[in-house]
Amino acid sequence: MRRIAIVHDWLTGMRGGERCLEVFCELFPEADLFTLLHRRKTISEVIERMRIRTSFIQHLPLAACFYRYYLPLFPLAVERFDFRGYDLILSSSHCVAKGAVRAPGTLHISYTYTPMRYAWDLYGAYFGDWTGPIASCIIPTLMGRLQRWDLRDRKSVV
């Protein structure tokens, strides 16, 4: 039997990406579902029935409510998932799930909804308008790193 891993950015509500994820879960109910963060009872029963594996982000202080502020850690979190022994990785991504690192011989198919827009042009829309000398130094540096990662991580997908 083929082992399948589904990777989704986070599970905190039912929006468009989660509706697609729900279909993937119906197609592959035996798959393991990897995600950065899972807030129970915020997603459909179809998704809740999956074997859900979360990242270290799940255990960070206040992550359930303020997970977006951990954005600079998201690439590290998704890259730390261990996919050895899986034949297929199916990532459902609008952020970092597409950056799942495949093991040799593993096929990675990514359904990418959009680029990581908050790293490119919509940071203020997602996080508010941070101003001040510290934010004006740190934010562009962090966003530059995320942009480079966003471009580089495409190489994991075959």
PLM features: what roles do these ranges have?
Residues 17-27:
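Short amphipathic alpha-helix
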Residues 28, 85-87, 105-106, 154-158:
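Short, well-ordered alpha-helix to beta-strand connector turns
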Residues 4, 30-31, 108:
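Hydrophobic anchor at the start of a short beta-strand
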Residues 13, 41-43, 97-101, 117-120:
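Short catalytic/ligand-binding loop motif for oxyanion handling, primarily in non-cytosolic enzymes
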Residues 27-98:
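Active-site donor-binding segments of glycosyltransferases and PAPS-dependent sulfotransferases
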Residues 1-12, 36-37:
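Nucleotide-activated donor-dependent transferases that construct or modify glycoconjugates
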Residues 88-91, 102-132:
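Active-site proximal beta-strand in glycosyltransferases
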Residues 128, 132-158:
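Membrane-proximal helix-turn-helix segments that form the acceptor-binding/catalytic region
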